[in-house]
């Protein structure tokens, strides 16, 4: 995969938004399934998207999923869904039925299983695995992505789509898209701002 380097985080976010919108506009006869991460980079992207690119985005053809979620209610400031809802989803005309959140307030193992089944139903399946059109990944300062932290290599080769997991630094429970699925989704777009 060719890396793209931009001079600022704002320019990175704008380029990513325009890329996603172009993908959707280039194929007007289908729905796109995108899995989003949380964190500071997506927060900037969501804010810019709502304020600068609402009118050019075919919201009715976008299905929104999450790469991971902290096990907190959506009102909690740590919720990835809550952040996206406040910065983007509550502002743009995306149909409610196109938003598929991880219910972080539920039992993590049961919710990972429920969300895995939901993704299998809503996302196109190839070779018995769902394949997102785009998976947007962030990278934490400690090396984690999709709530998979260094030392949690068992989540690199599981057959499960989503797994209950935890942050080894503070014990916070999370639900994570496993690396098995990240590898088969095309394209996966890692985002790193430094």
Report each predicted region and the residues it spans.
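Short, well-ordered amphipathic alpha-helices
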Residues: 20-21, 44-53, 85-88, 116-120
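Ligand-binding beta-strand-loop-alpha-helix segment within the catalytic cores
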Residues: 57-133
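Short gly/pro-enriched beta-turn/loop segments at secondary-structure junctions
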Residues: 128-134, 139-141, 185
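Class I SAM-dependent methyltransferase SAM-binding "motif I" and its flanking Rossmann-like core
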Residues: 137-180
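Single conserved hydrophobic/aromatic residue that forms the stacking wall/gate
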Residues: 183, 188-193
């Amino acid at each position: 995969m060719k890396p793209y380097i931009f001079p600022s985080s704002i320019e990175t976010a704008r380029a990513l938004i325009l890329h996603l919108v172009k993908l959707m506009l280039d194929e007007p006869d289908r729905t796109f399934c995108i899995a989003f991460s949380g964190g500071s980079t997506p927060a900037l992207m969501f804010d810019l998207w709502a304020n600068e690119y609402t009118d050019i985005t075919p919201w009715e053809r976008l299905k929104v999923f999450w790469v991971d979620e902290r096990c907190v209610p959506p009102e909690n400031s740590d919720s990835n869904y809550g952040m996206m809802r406040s910065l983007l989803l509550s502002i743009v005309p995306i149909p409610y039925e196109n938003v598929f959140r991880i219910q972080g307030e539920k039992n993590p193992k049961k919710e990972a299983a429920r969300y895995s089944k939901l993704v299998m139903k809503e996302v196109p399946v190839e070779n018995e695995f769902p394949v997102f059109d785009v998976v947007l990944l962030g990278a934490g300062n400690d090396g984690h992505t999709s709530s998979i932290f260094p030392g949690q290599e068992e989540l690199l080769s599981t057959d499960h789509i989503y797994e209950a997991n935890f942050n080894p630094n503070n014990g916070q429970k999370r639900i994570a898209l496993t690396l098995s699925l990240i590898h088969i989704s095309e394209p996966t777009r890692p985002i790193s701002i430094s």
